């Protein structure tokens, strides 16, 4: 039997447990950390310990990995507003206890009123700010549709899965130094792109130990609990989204919301040295990129090169350069463009891509300049869940940029994405 390996984007989903696992080197939430964590009956890994604990509790209550992933995502929408969301979108890839491979695409979609030149001025010059911030930057959110699409694989009622997020929004949670810095750093943008001050703005600065309470978000989550997917894409919440769009000349309409559907697509699956690797298909490039890179190195004796040696690093760099060149040229949304997946993933093609690779010969130093070293992004978040039944789920969810468009839906309490810039 082949071992199963689950991949999303370029992130290998490592199934470790709750609050102790953030990073061996970086601890943004000021909690105790450990290099390893173990569990016998399931595990949850996410960007915030509170959200991870929500997922663990769902597992303890008899839920499976799909249930825990849903609850964790909803909790992240409360405790990690910079990336966790209900106003954005995401990808889910999973392997079920019955051996089925699943991928769900619930990324944001362009509103029907969008046009090719909507971000150009009268002279045809791009107006970058319009696609990055404010109402016109937002696509139709897909997160809630994605959660309900994946719920059919769960065991527990949706109301039970969303209740922890409602409680966190209603009662609040204590913010850490990193969260205080993040909110304070975005204060001017929140003021600029909202007609009324959202809950993320205080007259004084946020301080570690402050409690962030989100009553409007709690009310929105209750509508979703009570009315299901229609509690977001129709009714009061949809009305509030469209009213917000009108205030800022955005494009999302009631029809856009009502017509949104998450799409279950065949996952990418390939063999690598005895493992079956499962990845997200287009419009995510992650699965195909991983397939290209792993297949380019499969017939090379990488073990003998050693870990992090100049030879192994050079090989990986050259492999990634070729894969990302293909990404820029050939990959896209297959609803609109034809992506030559079969060719890009064929062994013959990948062998040809590596024919000009020369071990020990790198790009000339005189054309290499120092790069900019940035901290870990706060703009997209990932979570992974494994349960005792044999289900494994990996999710990437995002608003695109940190805090998305910086626009909060007045009366509904959640941030909208700026995915139109992606």
Each PLM stretch: what is its role?
Residues 278-287, 380-384, 396-407:
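Glycine-rich phosphate/pyrophosphate-binding beta-alpha loops
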Residues 1-26:
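Bacterial Sec-dependent N-terminal signal peptides
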Residues 25-53, 65-66, 70-234, 238-281, ...:
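Noncatalytic scaffold domains of N-terminal-nucleophile
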Residues 292:
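Protein kinase glycine-rich loop
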Residues 195, 299-398, 412, 419:
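Internal maturation/activation junctions in enzymes
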